[in-house]
Amino acid sequence: MKTAIFTVVLALAVFAVLSFGWEANEKALSEEFTELIHEKGAASETEARECRYFWGECHDHMPCCDWLVCRYKWPITYNICVWNRTFPEK
């Protein structure tokens, strides 16, 4: 009986140590991922948007992208950019 209790307590201690190690590794990966996202985000922020994207609000002074067209869609009370059934050329 004492051996069984000792084995269970020892197993719980091993699991606690292993889970602490996994948690530390997961936190390091999370920080690395966050840094990578911030680097990529800073690079994309430098690009200026010259047109409105899909479902963006549009007017004469805010044009849609080339493959979109500005349309009034009910029940939305303003014009939005919708697909004009063409594909952008790259």
Curated annotation (Swiss-Prot):
Localization per record: Secreted
Tissue: Expressed by the venom gland.
Signal peptide: 1-19
A single GO cellular-component term on record: extracellular region
UniProt-listed Pfam families: Toxin_12 (PF07740)
Propeptide: 20-50
The UniProt record lists the keyword Iron-sulfur: no
Bridged cysteine pairs (disulfide): C51-C65, C58-C70, C64-C81
Keyword list, A-Z: Disulfide bond, Ion channel impairing toxin, Knottin, Secreted, Signal, Toxin
Listed GO MF terms: ion channel inhibitor activity; toxin activity
Family: Belongs to the neurotoxin 10 (Hwtx-1) family. 13 (Hntx-13) subfamily.
Job of this protein: Ion channel inhibitor.
Domain commentary: The presence of a 'disulfide through disulfide knot' structurally defines this protein as a knottin.
Protein name (Swiss-Prot/TrEMBL): U7-theraphotoxin-Hhn1a 8
